[in-house]
Curated annotation (Swiss-Prot):
Keywords: Host membrane, Membrane, Transmembrane, Transmembrane helix. GO terms for cellular component: host cell membrane; membrane. This is Putative transmembrane protein ORF166. It comes from Acidianus bottle-shaped virus (isolate Italy/Pozzuoli) (ABV). It comes from the Viruses. The chain crosses the membrane at residues 35-55, 60-80, 124-144. It is found in: Host membrane.
Length: 166
């Protein structure tokens, strides 16, 4: 129990209900209202990350870095990419070398430190992302042309209605 309390004290800024500097006065609270709203909206995700980080005894930022790529895979309409082949390795690093193709050496080292502890979690999220992408891709392929036609019709009606074919 003491370890969890120490962990929460160490990462109180990320794992707290409110940002650390907004509980001093009403003026601070009102000045930081947009940040507070973002904090409250992201509370379920932060709760999951902090609980997992506490159980695995790793930095919550490490968990967040490792969750973002699989979460992006799980939302194909945001990334507009097909999911890559899953592996149990960190997706961005060459194992053991700490070299990442798209990141500077400091971030590359951080990924490599996170890799061993969270590779199973990456695998699970990646597999879930592939399943979601497989389900959503045909639906999106059907919906996208309809949205394009609707937007085209609205633009046409607003610019020159006499040539829209009505």
């Amino acid at each position: 129990m003491a370890e969890i309390g120490e962990f929460l004290k160490k990462y109180a800024g990320f794992c707290g209900l409110l940002p650390p500097s907004v509980d001093n006065s009403l003026l601070d609270f009102l000045a930081n209202l947009p940040i507070i709203l973002v904090f409250l909206i992201t509370m379920p995700v932060r709760f999951f990350i902090c609980i997992f980080a506490g159980l695995a005894k790793v930095n919550p930022i490490c968990v967040l870095i490792n969750l973002l790529p699989p979460l992006a895979i799980a939302i194909p309409f945001v990334t507009a990419q097909t999911p890559p082949v899953c592996s149990t390795q960190c997706q961005y690093c060459q194992s053991g070398k700490g070299e990442c193709l798209n990141y500077n050496p400091t971030i590359a080292k951080y990924f490599t430190q996170c890799e061993k502890q969270l590779s199973v979690l990456n695998k699970i999220f990646c597999l879930v992302g592939i399943i979601i992408a497989d389900v959503l891709n045909p639906i999106l392929a059907f919906i996208n042309p309809l949205i394009y036609l609707a937007i085209h019709k609205v633009i046409c009606l607003n610019t020159n209605p006499c040539i829209c074919g009505l």
